[in-house]
């Protein structure tokens, strides 16, 4: 058992989309990374022989949750608007935990659609969902 104290700092998580650093992260979970493919699957045959297969689907889904006041909403909306017009709106995305060793980078990503919008007395959140091509991804500790 290690006696070393480990530290995570949310203000050391860098989100860069299309070369632009994002800011105005929501309180709580502000980035989620989900593998869309199955990775591996397995089955057992009638005689008990086990076989496994690898999914060729290398896509990931990334969700950035921002406060409604964040100017980064304008950046993501602009990328989506450009893609809607040109159909060529692919951009790189980088997520890096500078207080740890987790890094996610994809050369090609796109915004799926505009997030749902709610307005109230309080500051609301905007959850932007992106899909990426095959990334370089290291999920590690701090």
What are these regions (language model features)?
Residues 139-142:
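Short acidic DE-rich linear segments
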Residues 76-105:
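Short, acidic/charged, Gly/Pro-enriched secondary-structure junctions
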Residues 130-134:
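Short, structured patches in soluble enzyme cores that scaffold and shape functional sites
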Residues 2-68, 101, 108-127, 137:
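Solvent-exposed edge beta-strands and adjacent loop segments
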Residues 58-60, 64-84:
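Short, conserved turn/kink motifs that form compact alpha/beta structural patches or helix kinks used as
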């Amino acid at each position: 058992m290690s006696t070393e104290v480990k530290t995570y700092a949310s203000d050391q998580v860098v989100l860069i989309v299309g070369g632009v650093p994002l800011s105005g992260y929501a309180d709580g979970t502000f980035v989620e990374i989900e593998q869309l493919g199955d990775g591996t699957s397995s089955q057992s045959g009638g005689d008990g022989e086990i076989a496994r297969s690898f999914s060729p689907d290398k896509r990931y889904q990334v969700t950035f949750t921002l406060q409604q006041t964040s100017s980064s909403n304008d950046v993501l909306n602009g990328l989506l608007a450009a893609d809607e017009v040109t159909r060529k709106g692919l951009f790189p995305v980088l997520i890096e935990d500078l207080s740890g060793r987790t890094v996610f980078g994809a050369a090609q990503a796109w915004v799926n659609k505009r997030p749902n919008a709610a307005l109230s007395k309080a500051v609301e959140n905007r959850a932007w969902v992106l899909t990426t091509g095959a990334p370089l991804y290291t999920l590690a500790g701090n």
